[in-house]
């Protein structure tokens, strides 16, 4: 773990220490509910790309899948951190918009569960990282809205150039933001390459959120909860609370996942 990550993860961080007594922090990860086939079976499943669990484990945490069920937000009281994972599109009805023909993969049960999880995590001050769809969920949970199909807005498909895989594009990170500190660039604004696969993005920012990274075409690529700083809980109790539109678990740079786990460990240290 880098010096910058330790500095910005939160107070009380110590290498190799998560929960009090040296236990590893428990990180809940929101998941899909889909039909899947394996071996002789074809059944309704709760699933998640393994790279999420592998990244949390490599960062020193214990990953726990959170199925999209009513009342799952009660799990927040038993977690040290939360990842709002990627997935299909959020139902535009959640932010008062009509359905765009390009909006796809809507799962109302997942929307309801993750919006409740996001709100509960912020209220409790749980260390929280939104990834891709997770950023969009966090924004909608705070009353924001989404662009439903970016090619219609920016005139290209550079944010989702590969079907079934990830492309790459640079993002500009705001100097002196929490994100810049985690990535080791707390000074002047810098550009970093990120793995990308999304066709929706933030339109109107939700209450208490600030944008901290953008692509050259103006699309918001990261948000942070205002007042959630390295010195502890901020407004509405939020401590480490940020989200990115890209997929850090799919890339080589794992500093965001390490910072989340470190911040989660500080809650029980």
Feature locations, PLM:
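The feature captures the ABC ATPase H-loop/switch
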Residues: 135
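Conserved loop-to-beta-strand segment in the C-terminal subdomain of adenylate-forming
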Residues: 239
């Amino acid at each position: 773990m880098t010096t910058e990550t330790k500095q910005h993860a939160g107070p009380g961080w110590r290498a190799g220490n998560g929960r009090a007594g040296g236990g590893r922090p428990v990180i809940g990860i929101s998941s899909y509910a889909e039909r899947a086939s394996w071996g002789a079976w074809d059944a309704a499943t709760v699933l998640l790309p393994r790279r999420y669990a592998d990244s949390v484990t490599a960062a020193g945490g214990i990953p726990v899948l959170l199925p999209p069920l009513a009342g799952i937000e009660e799990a927040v009281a038993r977690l040290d951190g939360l990842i709002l994972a990627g997935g299909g599109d959020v139902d535009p009805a959640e932010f008062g918009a009509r359905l765009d023909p390009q909006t796809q993969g809507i799962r109302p049960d997942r929307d309801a569960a993750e919006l409740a999880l996001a709100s509960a995590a912020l209220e409790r001050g749980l260390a929280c990282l939104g990834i891709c769809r997770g950023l969009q969920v966090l924004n909608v949970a705070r009353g924001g809205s989404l662009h439903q199909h970016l090619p219609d807005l920016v005139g290209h498909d550079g944010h989702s150039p590969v079907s079934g895989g990830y492309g790459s594009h640079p993002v500009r990170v705001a100097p002196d933001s929490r994100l810049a500190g985690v990535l080791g660039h707390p000074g002047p604004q810098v550009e970093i390459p990120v793995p990308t696969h999304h066709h929706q993005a933030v339109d109107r920012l939700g209450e208490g959120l600030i944008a901290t990274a953008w692509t050259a075409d103006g699309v918001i690529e990261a948000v942070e909860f205002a007042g959630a700083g390295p010195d502890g809980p901020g407004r509405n109790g939020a401590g480490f609370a940020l989200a990115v539109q890209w997929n850090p678990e799919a890339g080589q740079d794992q500093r965001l996942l390490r910072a989340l786990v470190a911040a989660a460990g500080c809650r029980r240290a």
